[in-house]
């Protein structure tokens, strides 16, 4: 069947399935595509094995296997990610390769929360996944209603422990496999025909109503990482880069943040593809002409931003994935005092790593939290991604989980 073009009239939301291995994340992803397609024939259905053979992709120098599926409900268009292996989740969430506006936490009702359930919730907290909806899968394998209540309580407590609103967030119970089997035998099944399929609809309703539509990048406060700087004789200094978020207009005041002292200036012109514009918005590659700024006052690695919206920092706590030897990472462990380069947006800055108490060393392949002190300040906020490099090769990826100073 040919892929239909998606109507972009609906708001777009990025979500994904998270949870312990074999609890049914991929089966649920397949069941969701079949459920959505039963009401809308333009949606492509994907069977389990089509999702499970996730293609490799690269993000910040790291290879990750991720399956992307698309579907829509009456009110929204969704991009949904599912990863085959636990390590792929860790890498995906830390690099931000697949940004999630919300996640569906899949828990097997027969097993309850398991180690990776906890680990994925912690990761979601550290990398800033803002909303979680729970799907208690495999309820057909549990006869005891009290046992189901117990598992639900455990999951809610675990979420509360990691600062999610465990008491209030939606928990939907069902069986992804039973729903998938029902839909594979009758793809055009109407809602209300089969209870297992209806549980998937209930989950989609919960996702629709509980996970808010994200603010569009263009509506956020302006920020542009500086990639290059040059002088136009008689007109002044131009900083070029891709607008990361927000909008910038001619005559706007902006701050130049990072590496040295923050300074304010005014935008006197904006160019894109050699044409003059009134404004540049998220996603545009632009040249921004800055008033009264010398060529040496602005450099790659700084950002232009709305005044007061972002501050330069040197010390932060990070959640980090360290590449294994097979992934082209280090061959040996590192210890406290390790001094690699931290690549933020467009530049490398040297920093010193301080490990948490009780952690002797970090091995290639580890997922770890530690503190970093940079030798120069970088425009920083929680959720900012970075790569860790040695001599230009990537040895790790991280996300700022807490700004310290």
Curated annotation (Swiss-Prot):
Region (G4): 137-140
Family: Belongs to the TRAFAC class translation factor GTPase superfamily. Classic translation factor GTPase family. EF-Tu/EF-1A subfamily.
The protein's enzyme class: hydrolase
Species this protein is from: Deinococcus radiodurans (strain ATCC 13939 / DSM 20539 / JCM 16871 / CCUG 27074 / LMG 4051 / NBRC 15346 / NCIMB 9279 / VKM B-1422 / R1)
Record-linked InterPro entries: EF-Tu_GTP-bd, EF-Tu_GTPase, EFTu-like_2, EFTU_2, G_TR_CS, P-loop_NTPase, Small_GTP-bd, T_Tr_GTP-bd_dom
Taxon lineage: Bacteria, Thermotogati, Deinococcota, Deinococci, Deinococcales
Protein name: Elongation factor Tu
Predominant cellular place of this UniProt entry's protein: cytoplasm
Source species, domain of life: Bacteria
């Amino acid at each position: 069947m040919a892929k239909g073009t998606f109507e972009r009239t609906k708001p777009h939301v990025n979500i994904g399935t998270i949870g312990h291995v074999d609890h049914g994340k991929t089966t649920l992803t397949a069941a969701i595509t079949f459920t959505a397609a039963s009401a809308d024939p333009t949606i492509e259905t994907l069977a389990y094995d089509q999702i499970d053979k996730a293609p490799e992709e690269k993000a910040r120098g790291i290879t990750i296997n991720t399956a992307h599926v698309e579907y829509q409900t009456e009110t929204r268009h969704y991009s949904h990610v599912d990863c085959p292996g636990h390590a792929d989740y860790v890498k995906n969430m830390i690099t931000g390769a697949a940004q999630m506006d919300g996640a569906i936490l899949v828990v097997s009702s027969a097993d309850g929360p398991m180690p990776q359930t906890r680990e994925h919730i912690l990761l979601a907290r550290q990398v800033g996944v803002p909303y979680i909806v729970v799907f208690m899968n495999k309820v057909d394998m549990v006869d005891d209603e009290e046992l189901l209540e117990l598992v639900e309580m455990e999951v809610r407590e675990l979420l509360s422990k990691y600062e999610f609103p465990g008491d209030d967030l939606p928990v939907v119970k069902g069986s992804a496999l039973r729903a998938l089997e029902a839909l594979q035998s009758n793809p055009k099944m109407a809602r209300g025909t089969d209870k297992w399929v209806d549980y998937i609809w209930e989950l989609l309703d919960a996702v629709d109503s509980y996970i808010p539509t994200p603010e569009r990048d263009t509506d956020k406060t302006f920020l542009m990482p500086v990639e290059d700087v040059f002088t136009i004789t008689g007109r002044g200094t131009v900083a070029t880069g891709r607008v990361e978020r927000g909008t910038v207009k001619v005559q706007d005041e902006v701050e130049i943040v990072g590496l040295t002292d923050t300074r304010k200036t005014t935008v006197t012109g904006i160019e894109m593809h050699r044409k003059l514009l009134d404004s540049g918005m998220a996603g545009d590659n632009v040249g921004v002409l800055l008033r009264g700024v010398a060529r040496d006052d602005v450099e790659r690695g700084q950002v232009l931003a709305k005044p007061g919206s972002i501050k330069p920092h040197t010390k932060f706590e990070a959640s980090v994935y360290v590449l294994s030897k097979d992934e082209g990472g280090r061959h040996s462990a590192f210890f406290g005092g390790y001094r690699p380069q931290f690549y933020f947006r467009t530049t490398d800055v040297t920093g010193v790593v301080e490990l948490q108490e009780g952690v002797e060393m970090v091995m290639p392949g580890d997922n770890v939290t530690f503190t970093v002190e940079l030798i120069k300040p970088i425009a920083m906020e929680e959720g900012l991604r970075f790569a860790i490099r040695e001599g230009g090769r990537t040895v790790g990826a991280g996300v700022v989980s807490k700004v310290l100073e």
